[in-house]
Each structure stands twice: as C-alpha cells, then as structure tokens.
Amino acid sequence: MNRYTTMKQLGDGTYGSVLMGKSNESGELVAIKRMKRKFYSWDECMNLREVKSLKKLNHANVIKLKEVIRENDHLYFVFEYMKENLYQLMKDRNKLFPESVIRNIMYQILQGLAFIHKHGFFHRDMKPENLLCMGPELVKIADFGLARELRSQPPYTDYVSTRWYRAPEVLLRSSVYSSPIDVWAVGSIMAELYTFRPLFPGTSEVDEIFKICQVLGTPKKSDWPEGYQLASSMNFRFPQCIPINLKTLIPNASSEAIQLMTEMLNWDPKKRPTASQALKHPYFQVGQVLGSSAHHLDTKQTLHKQLQPLEPKPSSSERDPKPLPNILDQPAGQPQPKQGHQPLQTIQPPQNTVTHPPPKQQGHQKPPQTMFPSIIKTIPVNSVSTLGHKGARRRWGQTVFKSGDSCDDIEDDLGASHSKKPSMEACKEKKKESPFRFPDSGLPVSNHFKGENRNLHASVSLKSDPNLSTASTAKQYYLKQSRYLPGVNPKNVSLVAGGKDINSHSWNNQLFPKSLGSMGADLSFKRSNAAGNLGSYTTYNQTGYMPSFLKKEVGSAGQRIQLAPLGASASDYTWSTKTGRGQFSGRTYNPTAKNLNIVNRTQPVPSVHGRTDWVAKYGGHR
C-alpha cells in the first residue's frame, strides 16, 4: 500500500470502507476499498465473490478492479476512481433529466448488466448508489460484494439489495431467484431517473409489497402462480389494489419508456426481458449513438469539453465524450420519431405550440447522422455577433435584438429546447402585435426587465437603430420623451415638483432605485456608463427565492400605472399608489389599457399638494 497515498474517505459500507487515493507512480486517482474483516491467507481472499466476479469482468460499463493487496491481514481492492454515484448525480440537480440523458444512462447500465449476466454472474444489489458516474455521459456498475454466479447452487440469502429496488420474489423469500432481480432493480432505477423519487419507497418488506401493489395492481394467480405459492407459504395475502398507469406517475416519460419500464417491472420474473432483450427495445432505437465509446474518459477531458463553446444541437445525441453536462440543461430535444412529447418541466411556461415543433425538429435532425452536426442552416446570413459567448443555451443569430427583450428569453431560463423556440421573424411579429406585453406570461413586467438568467456582460443600447423593429423604435421614442422611466418611485416627487428637468439617463440616482426585476428573469440593473445605455444585466437571487409581491395578480405591486388616453393620445400616465406597499418601486402594466376603448378614468386627476397636473401642463396631446 506504500505505492498509494490515501487522500480522504469516500464512503463506508457493510463490508468495507472506501478511500480516495493517488498512485505515487502515475498520479492516477484510485478508489481503495478496505475490507473490515481480516484475511489470513491468499486462498481466503481469492474465494471472495467480489474478487472472483471482477477478475473475469472487463467492460466499459463495469468498474475495473486494478489490483488486490493483502497487507497485515487486511485486504484492499484498488478500483478505478469515479467522481460520483448516480444517487449523488440526481440529488445535486435542481431540475429533471431530459429523456435523451436518461436513455443514454439506461443504455450504459443495461450494457454492463448484459455483460455481467453473459459471464454467468448476477449483481443482487443494483441501486443508484452502486452505479458510479463521471457525469451522466459515463456510467459503470460497481460493488460486486453480493454478486453470485448464475450456476451456483441455491438457496440464496433472502436479504439482498436495498429494499426499494428489491424484486417481489426476493421480498416473498424465494430461494431460487436469479438474474431477473437485477432487471427489476434497473426498471425501478429508470423510473427514479425520470422523477428523482423512488417508485416503490417501502418502509418495510410488507410495506414494499404494498407499494408495488399500489402501482402495478394486485397480481392475478394466473399471472404469477409461483408468487401466490410463496405468499401462502409465509401466510401472506396480497393487498387488493387497482393498477395505476405509469404514465400518470411519470408524465415526462415517452410511451416507449413507459412500455420498457412496464415490461421490466413484471410480477413474474420469467416474463421480464433479459438485459440483452431490453437493449433491443424500441426505446433505444432512435438513430442516435448511445453508450460510452470513450471509457478512458478522465476529469480533465470532461472539464475541457464543458468549457468549449457550445453550439445548438437540436438532436443532442449522447456521443461520448460529446454529451457532457451541457445536455442536462436542455430538455429532451432528442430525435424521437414516435413521439412528440416534452419531458415534465414543472416550471415551464405554456408554449404557443406543442404539436408543431417536432416536424421542425426532424428537419434539423437529418444532417446530424454524421459525427459533427452542421449548424450553418440555422445561422442568418446577416447576423453579426456583438455580444460574444453568453452560455450554453444562447441561440446564434439572435443578437440583433439590441434592446435585450427577445421574446424567447424566459424560455431560455426555464430550459426550453432550441428546436421549440420561435424564429426571429415570429418573434418580431409578436413584438409588433403587442409591444408593451410580456410574451407567454401574465406577469406585469417592463420590457427592459426581461432577460436570460445568465451573466450578460454587454450593454443594452437605447439609441435608435434602423435594423430594429417598429415596436422597438416606438418604445425608444417613448423613453426619450417620457419623464417617467422604468423603476421610478412616484413618491420621490421633489425634483418634479420643483420644476427641475430629470435627466432620462441618470440611472444611478436616488430617484431611480434599482429595480427588483421580473420573476422570470431574476435580474437587477446596474449602471454601466452615463452615455445613455441601460446597464448590463447581472444575476441575483440564485436560490430561486421570489418576493411575495411579485406572485400576485396584475396591479398588486406597489404602484399601478393606468393608461388614460385623452383624445387620440395614449401617452399620458397617471399614478395611483396603494397604501402600505409604496416601498416597492417598479412599473406595472395594466392589461385593460391595451384596448383603448376601455378607459378606467375619463376625468384627469387634479393637482393636489404640489403634484403636477400633467394634463394641464401638456394639454393632453404630445
């Protein structure tokens, strides 16, 4: 063991603890498992199931046993090091996996399992903690402490595998179970990958059977006669339950995924597919390259790939080492010819179209049959990128919206796929339709407060530009002429009452407090220069906390602006301040004023206590 330097403890199990170490010769990171019981001879060591199993298994998706060391009657296994396990990968995420990622993970698990079964072993303890990962693009099966040879003689022990992933024949104390128990566990893991919740979270063995019955329904005697024999031998009666369609429990799974899980989670072990048969299921027949070809992937390569500029890939297939954690932030934009669904996104706003994007998606996915997908068709000819790299989900050719109010920005925040976003032309049409309305959201938000939840370091210019749409030009004209700018607190009227002219660009003023921004964007404005630019966006509120006043309906913020058009003009604004909420500045657009026929106040408010009568001052016409 003097050839390795131990660095820290990674975990502690029933039979041994795992340490992280480094080879003194090569500097390679390794995981060293130190067995708890002592071994007094090599023969005793070689008879260990873990040694017998792993000595024979060499596969890209099975953890590699580098060497076995016996020192001072202690036994050490030296394994290749993996960054994390599948449970940690799920736990550390703040949103669900897209189906493309789940498909690749499942493909690798089943590849490794098929290899193990082919060589005459079954694992007996398949669970997320025993699936080691280097991100979602490389998964390996580990911890063969309970592995048995298929040809070894029963009876086997009844306590195998963590309860939540334990097959019903094991729960009913069968002594002749075999490799189908691993397939059951993989089906349970697959459901958990979609929901981040265990499918059968039983608190005891009896409760575990009850949880299975709640989902799959009570088995019929004709469906599983051996199960009824096992139940009667231990005086157990199956609870009477009606089956629940897995689609209702896992709404973000495709129909092929539901079908595969249903087959793997069959009461009768004889009716479950083998791992090899599961790999041939239509769920995996999507025309993408699955599995890990680069099984020598190391952490440096992973980090290097993550830092490379990311291109929009509508068909982001799991080619290794290509599909690194960037695909985590994209929903399933995979080519799925037999489905047009989207994975469950609990925070995703309603999209304009649900059934139209897939055909468009298919059109973009024919070229990526080659190794490097072409993106030339998605780039406008006259687009000039002035803002540089913004993040993994920044769309190319969209930087011509200099006002920073692209109608797709909120979808970027919430993880909408590239292929399902409207084109620039459609976006411009939306803006022409309703220049003061925040698309796809009922929230009252100023147009300047929309943006992507990323570090956008470029200033957003208010100067007129012939390339901008009519809506943007009109908005700029309004902002030049208006004495009220977004974020002004109407209570601070000392300058206005004194007749002083307010500089429309003095944003770093007490009269112009920093806005809290919109709920969808979580942004605040900072001053970048005094030349008339709205400052660069900076993110805040990384925890996802949202002030309660932003959750309310239109007009529930501190002040409400209502358009009261006089004559043909709709440019005059009157403020009505609610009591008790005046500390929140920020304009709120009143949707009723969009229709000029609806006028809330036909009479102008007279000046009171020094407030300026704007109608009298400007005559109702600009």
Swiss-Prot record:
Short name of any one Pfam family annotated for the protein: Pkinase
Sites of Phosphothreonine modification: T157
Needed co-factor(s): Mg(2+)
Domain Protein kinase: 4-284
GO MF terms, alphabetically ordered: ATP binding; metal ion binding; protein kinase activity; protein serine kinase activity; protein serine/threonine kinase activity; transcription coactivator activity
Comp. bias (Polar residues): 336-355
InterPro entries: Kinase-like_dom_sf, MAP_kinase, Prot_kinase_dom, Protein_kinase_ATP_BS, Ser/Thr_kinase_AS
Main location: nucleus
Keywords linked to the UniProt accession: ATP-binding, Cell projection, Cilium, Cytoplasm, Cytoskeleton, Kinase, Magnesium, Metal-binding, Nucleotide-binding, Nucleus, Phosphoprotein, Serine/threonine-protein kinase, Transcription, Transcription regulation, Transferase
Gene Ontology annotations for the cellular component aspect, listed alphabetically: axoneme; centrosome; ciliary basal body; ciliary tip; cytosol; midbody; mitotic spindle; motile cilium
Description of post-translational modifications: Autophosphorylated. Phosphorylated on serine and threonine residues.
Binding annotation for ATP: L10, G11, D12, G13, T14, Y15, G16, S17, V18, K33
Tissue: In pre- and postmeiotic male germ cells in testis. In photoreceptor cells of the retina and in the olfactory receptors, and in certain epithelia of the respiratory tract and choroid plexus (brain).
Active site: D125 (proton acceptor)
Disulfide bonds: none
GO biological process, alphabetically ordered: negative regulation of non-motile cilium assembly; non-motile cilium assembly; photoreceptor cell maintenance; protein autophosphorylation; protein phosphorylation
Region (Disordered): 301-371
Reaction(s) the record says it catalyses: L-seryl-[protein] + ATP = O-phospho-L-seryl-[protein] + ADP + H(+); L-threonyl-[protein] + ATP = O-phospho-L-threonyl-[protein] + ADP + H(+)
Keyword Transferase carried by entry: yes
Subunit structure: Interacts with AR and CDK20. Found in a complex containing MAK, AR and NCOA3. Interacts with FZR1 (via WD repeats). Interacts with RP1.
PANTHER family reported for this sequence: MITOGEN-ACTIVATED PROTEIN KINASE
Similarity-based family: Belongs to the protein kinase superfamily. CMGC Ser/Thr protein kinase family. CDC2/CDKX subfamily.
Protein name in the entry: Serine/threonine-protein kinase MAK
Organism, as annotated: Mus musculus
Gene it is expressed from: Mak
